[in-house]
Amino acid sequence: MLTISVPATSANLGPGFDSIGLALDMQLTLQVLQPSDHWQIDHPFGADVPTDERNLIIKTALHLVPDLQPQHLQMASKIPLARGLGSSSTAIVAGLVLANELTGATRSSAELLEVATQLEGHPDNVAPALLGGLVVATNTDGRVRAVKLPLPMLFASVYVPNEPLLTTASRQALPTELAYHQAVTGSSVANTLVAALATQNWDVALPLLEQDQFHEQYRAKLVPALQTVRDHAHALGLTGTYLSGAGPTVITLGDYGQLATLQAQLSQDTTLTGQLFLLPMDATGVKVQKS
């Protein structure tokens, strides 16, 4: 049996808009049960998620290999849909690896990343899903360039609101252009953040996660929990709270003990009715097991 596991991802790390992402230890697992005369995928997400060729995992696999032999698949996932934790990216990566494995192809991670970025539109979710850990990536001149940084010895306090926020709606909240001085500030903050992440200088990196100039201020009205969680963190002397992906999930990075204290506070706030997770990073990205 072929089993593929793909980690959840958190993109747009602070000012790292569309470019910095990390993998979290929350998995989508895909099992290949047996060949079939038609595509079928069993999953726990109900009627809104297709179980045939319209399913994103299968669509992606067929994009890579159009004549792929149909299979009966089973998918389990702890990653909530449309919450800013890379649910679509994990499906895309699972589909690409599925096609790669079923055909015995030897496409490299770099080749799969190129295709995944074409399908997703930007690399900051698909790159950590493929590679694991903390990844800085860009898609320019028709080429994806990704750099995997040392794995942060940090944990993530993850607050997931009950209501989804579709990426399309969240994107519509963004301006079509930025003032020059704001763009320069955003660039300098992002550059310094990357340097701090690369050297694991958390005294610099964690505050900079809250200095985004590109998207959070425009999306904040759609995600009131962002300021609420940040206020609780600041009351404990913690920085490092940011909007994960397009939202609505809010993440705070830090020490396990400090984040456990934060989550105890968040659980007492009656305005926060969603789910809380305290997660380590995923170091390896997509994994394949054959049995």
UniProtKB/Swiss-Prot annotation:
Belongs to the GHMP kinase family. Homoserine kinase subfamily. The keyword Ion transport does not apply. Disulfide bonds: none annotated. This is Homoserine kinase. SUPFAM superfamilies: GHMP Kinase, C-terminal domain (SSF55060), Ribosomal protein S5 domain 2-like (SSF54211). One of its GO terms (molecular function) is homoserine kinase activity. Transmembrane segments: none annotated. It is found in: Cytoplasm. GO terms for cellular component: cytoplasm. Catalyzes the ATP-dependent phosphorylation of L-homoserine to L-homoserine phosphate. Gene3D superfamilies: 3.30.230.10, GHMP kinase, C-terminal domain. It comes from the Bacteria. Its main location: cytoplasm. Its EC number is 2.7.1.39. One of its GO terms (biological process) is threonine biosynthetic process. Pfam families: GHMP_kinases_C (PF08544), GHMP_kinases_N (PF00288). Keywords: Amino-acid biosynthesis, ATP-binding, Cytoplasm, Kinase, Nucleotide-binding, Threonine biosynthesis, Transferase. It catalyses: L-homoserine + ATP = O-phospho-L-homoserine + ADP + H(+). InterPro entries: GHMP_kinase_C_dom, GHMP_kinase_C_sf, GHMP_kinase_N_dom, GHMP_knse_ATP-bd_CS, Homoserine_kinase, Ribosomal_Su5_D2-typ_SF, Ribsml_uS5_D2-typ_fold_subgr. Pathway: Amino-acid biosynthesis; L-threonine biosynthesis; L-threonine from L-aspartate: step 4/5. HAMAP family: Homoser_kinase. It is an enzyme of class 2 (transferase). ATP binds at residues 80-90.
